[in-house]
A protein has these predicted regions:
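Long, low-complexity, charge-biased intrinsically disordered regions
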Residues: 3-407
Length: 407
């Protein structure tokens, strides 16, 4: 029996005519439907998704080919509903846009958000503006926004552990659109958004953005400034050494875009601060992530003796090992007394490069993030692999065996 996606359009008919488009498109992908019928219905969904450790982002058309497209569509509906309910844009006739004003495209990005063990946490749909179509001096100026340094994160987590401080994480929902837009920006209707249900012609209308959507060049700066002003108004001072660390008498806050870590010795300081955000004039919308167990893909766990903690990135290591093509169940790992900083290069390194079916530069990027975040012992081999402009797969395979053995 063929599987079809069925969902009820919301937003006063905003997506009414799109339902048929989605159903027709998904039904045309017979193989995807067969996978959904024969696999997902016979296995627990978590058994399949835990095996597929993908971290790919999908476009609108690619999302429709996925066996769990129905879950992505629900996330898309929620994303659109959140934007409309918070007046992030205004639908206006195309003729009302200033003469000669360039409208930018809207882009959907879909991704499966996972727990550290690989299970799916949620299906994420993100509506972005095509910032590459903006014009400097017309609809944007300054764009730079700082991000927290991992040195600050590690240092403050160590301090929190030593002093037995309270830690808590919060995640701002639709963070960028919570910031005002200083100049008007006009955007085409996103894929899946149709006005036919309202008796209007979609081609005759555009969106006038009221807030800083994701993708806009100035979006990150506008959001950072809004959050910074809110923290300063609550008695926090920006750290001299790191502009994303804010300090008050009772609390320290680490800010990484829309993810924050709250650290305090006072048991009531964190709840009081969260309440002030909920009731404040900024109208912040966020979720309380509870105690800090995972942050930015890095898992933290206290040592059994209670005198320290470990930081690990198991999902990233999985991606590196699988990208090279190793089977984690059968590949021989390396776990010996030779330090990871031991040089990997030898006299044959200048020989012809070996061909491989994986992206060498992508792996270098992942290794760079891994060694800079939780595995400083990999700095030397990562540096040596990165110094080569051509693929030397024997180096990468040797390093991956080390990763597999020191999981």
């Amino acid at each position: 029996m063929a599987t079809t996606l069925q969902w009820t359009p919301t937003l006063n008919g905003l997506y009414s005519s799109t339902e048929n488009l989605v159903l027709a498109t998904v039904n045309s992908y017979h193989s995807a439907n067969q996978l959904f019928d024969n696999t997902l219905n016979s296995l627990h969904p978590m058994a399949l998704v835990a095996e597929k450790q993908d971290n790919e982002a999908y476009t609108f058309k690619e999302m429709l080919r996925q066996p769990d497209a129905a879950d992505f569509i629900q996330a898309m509906m929620k994303e659109a509903s959140d934007h409309e309910s918070r007046d992030h844009w205004t639908v206006i006739p195309r003729s009302k846009a200033p003469l000669g004003e360039k409208t930018i495209l809207a882009i959907w990005a879909f991704k499966r958000k996972r727990f550290p063990d690989g299970r799916i946490n949620k299906w994420k749909a993100r509506l972005c503006a095509h910032g590459g179509m903006q014009t400097y001096g017309v609809n944007y100026w300054d764009t730079y926004a700082p991000t927290v340094n991992w040195i600050s994160i590690r240092f403050l987590l160590v301090v929190a552990q030593i002093l037995d401080l309270n830690t808590q994480a919060i995640d701002f929902v639709l963070a960028f659109p919570q910031a005002d837009l200083e100049v008007p920006v006009y955007m085409e209707l996103p894929a899946g958004m149709d006005l036919e249900g309202r008796g209007l012609s979609s081609s005759s209308y555009v969106l006038k953005l009221n807030k800083s959507l994701y993708g806009l060049k100035q979006g990150s700066l506008n959001w950072h400034n809004k959050l910074k002003d809110a923290l300063i108004n609550r008695g926090f001072v920006e750290s001299i050494s790191d502009p994303c660390v804010f300090i008050s008498k009772k609390m320290i806050i680490l800010v990484y875009v829309d993810d924050c870590i709250l650290i305090s010795k006072d048991d009531i300081a964190i709840p009081a601060f969260i309440k002030s955000l909920e009731e404040g004039p900024e109208n912040f919308v966020f979720t309380d992530e509870g105690s800090l167990e995972s942050y930015l893909g890095v898992s933290t766990e206290k040592c059994p003796d209670g005198k320290g903690f470990t930081m690990s990135q198991p999902l990233l290591i999985d991606r590196i090992i699988k990208a090279i093509g190793f089977d984690m169940a059968t590949t021989k790992s390396v776990r010996d007394n030779v330090p990871a900083c031991y040089p990997l290069l030898n006299k044959d390194v200048d020989g012809p490069a070996k061909k491989a079916n994986w992206k060498y530069r992508s792996l270098i990027g992942m290794l760079g993030y891994l060694q800079g975040t939780s595995r400083p012992d990999l700095s030397m081999p990562t540096h040596q692999c990165a110094s080569l402009t051509m693929t030397q797969n024997f180096l990468m395979r040797g390093l991956s065996r080390k990763l597999l053995g020191t999981y």
